[in-house]
Amino acid sequence: MKKLLCAASFGIALAFSAGAQAADKIAVVNVGEIFQQLPAREAVAKQLENEFKNRASELQRMETDLQSKIQKLQRDGSTMKSSERTNLEKEVMAKREEFGKKAQAFEQDHRRREMEERNKILSRIQDAIKVVAGKEGYDIVIDANAVAYSVSGKNITASVLKQVK
């Protein structure tokens, strides 16, 4: 009986010591901070701005044209012939619908491209995390936003940022 009790307590002690060893190989990284500090993020933002500049200016031109027609209708609608006013109202409605469709397509395309570029950058960050974790011997790397408390010595954000740059 004493041998069984001794073996059980030895097994429990082993289990607790294995957990303590695993905790030594956990690191924390702040992916959001790395993302914000990357110069590539600003370059991508400028690239997307240039990519969508023509469509944005076309939408602004369409909006200005639509606003001028609406103002003309409001200003001169009461003095216009009935057929002219009807034609202008139809034109305004058609332009408003066309503008809405183009604006929605623009927003969707812009959002899609932003997500593509963001995912490329996040993939680079993820690869850098794997490299740094492998070099420093960490088994688990957790995002700092998911951790309530961590020891500052186990934060590998700076190392990952250097690796990504």
From Swiss-Prot:
One of its GO terms (cellular component) is cytosol. Residues 102-113 are annotated as: Lipopolysaccharide binding. GO terms for biological process: chaperone-mediated protein folding; protein stabilization. It is found in: Periplasm. Coiled coil: none annotated. The keyword Signal applies. Keywords: Chaperone, Periplasm, Signal. It comes from the Bacteria. Residues 1-22 form the signal peptide. The keyword Repressor does not apply. One of its GO terms (molecular function) is unfolded protein binding. Molecular chaperone that interacts specifically with outer membrane proteins, thus maintaining the solubility of early folding intermediates during passage through the periplasm. Homotrimer. Belongs to the Skp family. This is Chaperone protein Skp.
